[in-house]
């Protein structure tokens, strides 16, 4: 009887503890693939999970997840979006060449696929994402209006798909995915001044203060979103570095003063420790080669307080 109680207690720990990772099995076959490996990029993790492809393109992989999340299945330049959750078993048949060309609907799931993955397939096959030439040719006012229209259209793609299918789904994941697909558009704001000057040098319009619509649309300083949304870290680190750079664009003091003021600006943002640390690390790495011994000592000292 005592052993039965112990077994039940262990089972309860696994079921009740959300941090206990559970296995997800993915197997299938690739055609027109590159090399002899397939990779899984799990949102929020720095390392990849890899699986070997045999001579016929077959593979089998076991992932460990503690909750439903976004996973990219990758081979060469082909990448396919998946929603995977603890306990799932998935079989997939994929032509890597077609995926590289954006034919996401060509993927076959012999044993069925979840609504979340179908939502992403629908989105990526129908999303509105302008070319560089189309995106940066517009004046600041036109650019802002265009981005606002694109966001509305793309959000509609997701919401309409979810409403049209009455089956259940992970609402939290869908909400995070709606943030995820905005990140590439949000990043375009960082490149707008340079690309616009190249593509439309005649336009001398001033950039208004409320130019960046993603200042309000995308949450900032939220550890959960920062860690869970695919490539959100890259966006937010760039966002805060750009914000500080703009505040210091007219600074004319000595390098040592600049780095001290930079860290003062970072502290004034009151960011979560992880985010502040990542922002500082990015800034330091970008300027590492130009640092004098005096500046290095300042950076070493100020970094301890981040």
What would you call each of these model-derived segments?
Residues 260, 276-306:
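N-proximal helix/coil linker or "cap" segments that precede and/or mark the start of modular domains
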Residues 179-193, 274-289:
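Short, hydrophobic/amphipathic alpha-helical patches that form generic packing surfaces
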Residues 3-13:
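Sec-dependent N-terminal signal peptides
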Residues 5, 36-37, 236, 258:
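Acidic, low-complexity intrinsically disordered regions
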Residues 16-176, 180, 188-192:
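A non-transmembrane, solvent-exposed segment enriched in polar/low-complexity residues
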